[in-house]
Amino acid sequence: MVRVIAISNLRLAQAFVDYMATRHVALEVKPDSQGAEIWLTDDEQLPQVQHELEQFLLDPLNPRYQAASWQSGNLHSNLPYQRFSYLQTLRSQAGPLTLSVMVLCIAIYILMQIVGDGAVMSWLAWPRDNSQYLQIWRWVSHAFLHFSLLHILFNLMWWWYLAGQMEKRLGTGKLLVLTIVSALFSGWGQSLFSGVNFGGLSGVVYALMGYVWLTGERAPERGISLPRGLMAFSVLWLVAGYFDILGLSIANAAHVSGLIIGLLMAFWDTRNSAKTTQ
């Protein structure tokens, strides 16, 4: 059997299993203290499951999933669909650090709209010269700066999805270390190419992508994962940034630096798990 994913909402996990049953794919739900794990019986069906899982994660409340439960008869189980609350879902799948960073980014973004980008960057941007090196918050605070609504929405969506599961499964301390280290190195990498005029959480997000994906591949028992299709999309997005296909100003060096840091940290943290499975 292959572990597919861990989901904090047991009812939604069962809905996905029921839906895949209509596609003639046998999955098994294993409840745990933080929700449920979904396991696949036939390894050869993994690519199909990963593809469907990507669609499910984008829209887990789509009526087709509940309809599948009706079709399978599993609505008679003690797993009722509760009234959906975005706030409840947001909180249930994120720890205190995940939520705190989201609130901080939103507060800083609002402040930037009020007083202007320049005023906020003068306090929070990457150190301009050695006179600012001792203002140690600058080595990390640049990650909380966002310059458009699309910029902050995209980053916070990924942050919530990746940091949330990491904090829930591996603890706040592990997430804090990765956040600080990746913010430091991604900021340093970007400063070599663009000076200090940059900001955003994307370097940290790419570190999370690398960490969560590789940890899921090498140590699935730790309960965090990123589907390979989403990881491939993220890499393609990174490559597109270098060729300016999308016409956006993208901090490519921060993305690459963050991704490398995340992969290296995951490789180190899973070195013993990899040896055990060999």
Curated annotation (Swiss-Prot):
<keyword id="KW-0645">Protease</keyword>
<keyword id="KW-0378">Hydrolase</keyword>
<comment type="similarity">
    <text>Belongs to the peptidase S54 family.</text>
</comment>
<comment type="function">
    <text>Rhomboid-type serine protease that catalyzes intramembrane proteolysis.</text>
</comment>
<keyword id="KW-0720">Serine protease</keyword>
<feature type="transmembrane region" description="Helical">
    <location>
        <begin position="95"/>
        <end position="115"/>
    </location>
</feature>
<protein>
    <recommendedName>
        <fullName>Rhomboid protease GlpG</fullName>
        <ecNumber>3.4.21.105</ecNumber>
    </recommendedName>
</protein>
<feature type="transmembrane region" description="Helical">
    <location>
        <begin position="170"/>
        <end position="190"/>
    </location>
</feature>
<dbReference type="InterPro" id="IPR022764">
    <property type="entry name" value="Peptidase_S54_rhomboid_dom"/>
</dbReference>
<feature type="transmembrane region" description="Helical">
    <location>
        <begin position="245"/>
        <end position="267"/>
    </location>
</feature>
<keyword id="KW-1133">Transmembrane helix</keyword>
<keyword id="KW-0812">Transmembrane</keyword>
<dbReference type="InterPro" id="IPR038236">
    <property type="entry name" value="GlpG_N_sf"/>
</dbReference>
<feature type="transmembrane region" description="Helical">
    <location>
        <begin position="143"/>
        <end position="163"/>
    </location>
</feature>
<dbReference type="InterPro" id="IPR022732">
    <property type="entry name" value="Peptidase_S54_GlpG_N"/>
</dbReference>
<keyword id="KW-0472">Membrane</keyword>
<dbReference type="GO" id="GO:0006508">
    <property type="term" value="P:proteolysis"/>
</dbReference>
<keyword id="KW-1003">Cell membrane</keyword>
<feature type="transmembrane region" description="Helical">
    <location>
        <begin position="224"/>
        <end position="241"/>
    </location>
</feature>
<dbReference type="Pfam" id="PF12122">
    <property type="entry name" value="Rhomboid_N"/>
</dbReference>
<feature type="transmembrane region" description="Helical">
    <location>
        <begin position="192"/>
        <end position="212"/>
    </location>
</feature>
<dbReference type="InterPro" id="IPR023662">
    <property type="entry name" value="Rhomboid_protease_GlpG"/>
</dbReference>
<feature type="active site" description="Nucleophile">
    <location>
        <position position="202"/>
    </location>
</feature>
<keyword id="KW-0997">Cell inner membrane</keyword>
<dbReference type="Pfam" id="PF01694">
    <property type="entry name" value="Rhomboid"/>
</dbReference>
<dbReference type="InterPro" id="IPR035952">
    <property type="entry name" value="Rhomboid-like_sf"/>
</dbReference>
<feature type="active site">
    <location>
        <position position="255"/>
    </location>
</feature>
<dbReference type="GO" id="GO:0005886">
    <property type="term" value="C:plasma membrane"/>
</dbReference>
<dbReference type="GO" id="GO:0004252">
    <property type="term" value="F:serine-type endopeptidase activity"/>
</dbReference>
